[in-house]
Regions:
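Charged low-complexity intrinsically disordered patches
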Residues: 2-4, 114-124
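Winged helix-turn-helix DNA-binding recognition segment
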Residues: 47-111
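Short recognition helix of helix-turn-helix/winged-helix DNA-binding domains
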Residues: 1-70
Length: 124
């Protein structure tokens, strides 16, 4: 059997990674969240790093992202229907909020998973 090679020295730092919050696995609140929805959330969190750089901050100082359905499908290597299902699941868990405006790209607010206070925010 052939094996992959080892990492040597600084090679161990050469890749970037998606981070999935540990809380998604060790907190009962998230036990019913599907693994693919957890993965999608990690993609959305990663995209948050662009928010400040691209001035994706609303008038209430809340960061948001723009991430097209097509791009998510491509990045996750899954179908459009699958992404729609995972996005809906994240919405149902309160982990994202979507704002759609006619003729504009959807805005996605990635909610802070570590804060359990479920407040009904108006994002209009």
């Amino acid at each position: 059997m052939k094996y992959f090679d080892f990492y040597y020295g600084d090679e161990s730092e050469q890749y970037s990674f998606y981070t999935v919050p540990k809380m998604f696995f060790d907190n009962d609140k998230f036990k019913d969240l599907s693994p693919m929805s957890k993965l999608l959330y990690s993609f959305l969190l990663d995209r948050m790093s662009l928010s400040k750089k691209r001035n994706w901050i609303d008038d209430k100082n809340r960061a948001y992202i723009k991430y097209s359905l097509k791009a998510i499908c491509n990045d996750m290597c899954v179908s459009k229907n699958s992404v729609i299902k995972y996005m809906k699941e994240l919405q149902n868990f309160g982990l994202i909020r979507k704002l759609s405006k006619e003729g504009m790209e959807d805005i996605i607010y990635v909610m802070d998973f570590s804060k359990f206070n479920q407040v009904d925010y108006d994002i209009q």
